């Protein structure tokens, strides 16, 4: 499975340059294969008198020895008739322990240290695992976060969509998952920044360094200011690193993509540059195929998994837009982060009613778990239905039964909050891990009214039942 860049197989000449699209002429009997990486030397505008190497990826064979390529870097300074070398292999990236704590670009170049890598590399274009290699059983991925494990359980080797605007705790939740995979599951994480703002990427690296999770994480960035070819391939580069950890090191991997919409957007730009006829809403005609090539590689093989969390931007909040709609078809769970919930100071600010999971079903989880989740959802839904009446008439106008629903729902809502490990640097409070069995027992007890006499404040930002009792004790309740 080891792959290194082969020696040059042929030399061609630049025939045409149109922005990131470069047409290259080769001898008819030495045409490079689709997805092969080509190298061309060009004057480096940053260093006078020096040359830099541009990487081009073959996208189309036009015939008569002509190939159309997409450049992975800006083509400023590239001239016609410049010699182009076929590397004989696809773009490849470093794999293995070397990648942990490092920041890479799409081409596998290290960005945060000067250390050069001479070890094993894998090509970014790889086949999905064969059907007989896939893990057949559906297993829950326990995180220790109450609201996720109880109401929107994640699938080991599944794909989770993460919805949330700015400032609702998306980055903290991502970092917390990286921390928990490293410490609770002895796993590793890979983060692919697809079309990330440079500032966002820089902030993420700084925050991960401060919270101590960066040494268990490989980061790959294709920034917003880079050509579409780079932004289209960066997710594949990150996924290739994740596949090595899964297949060779036999680890459970958490793979983050931020933002999957920008992957689609980059594909649309490349499709237009290649002259393809646009499809619905101007997207590329091969949208579903392109998404499938990425998503089908994110899966569990026998005993080991890649679990993916994908941040999803929804254009104009239109869920029927082809980009998010195509992504939804692949998701096993959706975690919606809500601004109104974060404004109450409840973190993680997961919306318990909007968030869903494929395995929140008695066929996949214990009946006790399913029943507890349904009780919590029902009580929160009733509380939501009563909000308008409370806003207009006040809580005193409700019947006794409705008052009891509101009383317990407010406690349930606050008990869904939890301190995270990575936020300790801001809060000074240790994070908590709550086993699923304890979460189920706790929420059943709250819904049964066992803790009706505890004040609401006692339920806020605590872990399990012991934390709840300690909080109540501090507030003077026995």
Swiss-Prot record:
Binding residues annotated for ATP, in chain numbering: 164-171
Could you give one GO CC term from the UniProt record? proton-transporting ATP synthase complex
Q: Where in the cell is it found?
A: Cell membrane
Disulfide linkage: none
Q: Which SUPFAM superfamilies match?
A: C-terminal domain of alpha and beta subunits of F1 ATP synthase, N-terminal domain of alpha and beta subunits of F1 ATP synthase, P-loop containing nucleoside triphosphate hydrolases
What Enzyme Commission number(s) does the record list for this chain?
7.1.2.2
**InterPro entries given for it?**
AAA+_ATPase, ATP-synt_VA_C, ATP_synth_F1_bsu, ATPase_a/bsu_AS, ATPase_alpha/beta_chains, ATPase_F1/V1/A1_a/bsu_N, ATPase_F1/V1/A1_a/bsu_N_sf, ATPase_F1/V1/A1_a/bsu_nucl-bd
Catalytic activity, reaction form: ATP + H2O + 4 H(+)(in) = ADP + phosphate + 5 H(+)(out)
One MF term in GO for this entry? ATP hydrolysis activity
Report the function annotation for this chain: Produces ATP from ADP in the presence of a proton gradient across the membrane. The catalytic sites are hosted primarily by the beta subunits.
Q: Which family does it belong to?
A: Belongs to the ATPase alpha/beta chains family.
Query: What protein is this chain from?
Result: ATP synthase subunit beta
**Which source organism does the UniProt entry give?**
Streptomyces coelicolor (strain ATCC BAA-471 / A3(2) / M145)
The gene for this chain is atpD
